[in-house]
């Protein structure tokens, strides 16, 4: 069964995740395929992006699709007053799939409800970033050969980081041993997210208390652009720095992930450690997104 939309990490079943991992393995070293020949992908980025936009663009091209779209809201008719619904309807006329990033929570879900073609959420406000969660879990799977039974820790901005919401929700499809949530009190995971989780969760403010238990340390930057109050941002912007002292206390085979971009939350000297996997993680974005495109468009009969 092909995927219809990928708006939330909960749109994927456990089997979907493993099928995407298997496809990503096959696509990793591929130069060019024609699976999506004759298809058009719209990249509708109403909010700025570098890595996500470029990796989706590359993934589509490597599968043989043509790519159209825009990189900011200012370059669209929305700047002239057009509403989002009309923009989505117009893109339906030009393409077979829309990859969408937007500053408002729930924008991708709204688009999926009016679109006749698949919507892939490339990040909507502080809500979700489901394809990043697939990349995150694929990296864990490649490192350990499994996801079940592993101990995770998410560190940093757990309130505004949409990658955190998607990863926590994605983990409900697996059986982690436990998940530590490490953040300042002002940046804790929102209660409505915690209420959805079906695995053991422990909240703390001190990474040193739990670092020796962790298999996967997932670090996020403080989301400056989500803060309404600049003063509040200044209070927490350097709450945590993953440095060599902390890393040296990790398990030898423990891994450090980061969805990027990194600011100051990981000391650059950590980059050379065996635990640092965030650049490898980034290298998996294209094959994972190729797999996702294949799942929503490959071998799909036109309506």
Curated annotation (Swiss-Prot):
Gene giving rise to this polypeptide: pyrB
The pathway where this protein functions is: Pyrimidine metabolism; UMP biosynthesis via de novo pathway; (S)-dihydroorotate from bicarbonate: step 2/3
Task: Name the GO terms of the biological process aspect.
Answer: 'de novo' pyrimidine nucleobase biosynthetic process; 'de novo' UMP biosynthetic process; glutamine metabolic process
Q: Function of this protein?
A: Catalyzes the condensation of carbamoyl phosphate and aspartate to form carbamoyl aspartate and inorganic phosphate, the committed step in the de novo pyrimidine nucleotide biosynthesis pathway.
Q: Which Gene3D superfamilies match?
A: Aspartate/ornithine carbamoyltransferase
- MF terms (GO), sorted A to Z: amino acid binding; aspartate carbamoyltransferase activity
EC category:
transferase
EC number(s) in its UniProt entry?
A: 2.1.3.2
Where does this protein come from, organism-wise? Saccharolobus solfataricus (strain ATCC 35092 / DSM 1617 / JCM 11322 / P2)
Q: Which UniProt keywords apply?
A: Pyrimidine biosynthesis, Transferase
Q: What protein am I looking at?
A: Aspartate carbamoyltransferase catalytic subunit
Taxonomic lineage of the native organism? Archaea, Thermoproteota, Thermoprotei, Sulfolobales, Sulfolobaceae
- What family is this? Belongs to the aspartate/ornithine carbamoyltransferase superfamily. ATCase family.
């Amino acid at each position: 069964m092909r995927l219809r939309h990928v708006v939330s990490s909960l749109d994927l079943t456990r089997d979907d995740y493993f099928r995407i991992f298997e496809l990503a393995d096959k696509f990793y070293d591929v130069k060019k395929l024609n699976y999506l020949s004759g298809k058009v992908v719209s990249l509708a980025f109403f909010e700025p992006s570098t890595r996500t936009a470029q990796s989706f663009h590359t993934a589509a091209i490597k599968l043989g699709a043509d790519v159209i779209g825009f990189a900011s809201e200012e370059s669209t008719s929305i700047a002239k007053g057009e509403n989002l619904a009309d923009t989505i309807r117009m893109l339906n006329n030009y393409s077979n799939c829309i990859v969408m990033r937007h500053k408002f929570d729930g924008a991708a879900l709204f688009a999926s409800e009016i679109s006749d073609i698949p919507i892939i959420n490339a990040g909507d406000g502080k809500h979700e970033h489901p394809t990043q969660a697939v990349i995150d879990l694929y990296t864990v799977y490649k490192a350990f050969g499994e996801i079940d039974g592993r101990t995770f820790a998410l560190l940093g901005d757990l309130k505004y980081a949409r990658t955190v919401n998607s990863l926590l929700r994605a983990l409900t499809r697996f059986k982690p041993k436990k998940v530590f949530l490490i953040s300042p009190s002002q940046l804790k995971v929102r209660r409505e997210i915690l209420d959805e989780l079906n695995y053991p969760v422990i909240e703390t403010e001190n990474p040193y208390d739990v670092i020796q238990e962790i298999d996967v340390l997932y670090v996020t930057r403080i989301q400056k652009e989500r803060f309404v109050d600049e003063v509040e941002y200044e209070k927490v912007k350097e709450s945590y720095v993953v440095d060599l002292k902390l890393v040296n206390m990790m398990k030898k085979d423990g891994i450090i992930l980061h969805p990027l971009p990194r600011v100051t939350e990981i000391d650059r000297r950590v980059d050379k450690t065996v635990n640092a996997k965030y650049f490898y993680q980034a290298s998996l974005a294209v094959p994972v997104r190729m797999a996702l495109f294949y799942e929503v468009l490959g071998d799909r009969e036109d309506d």
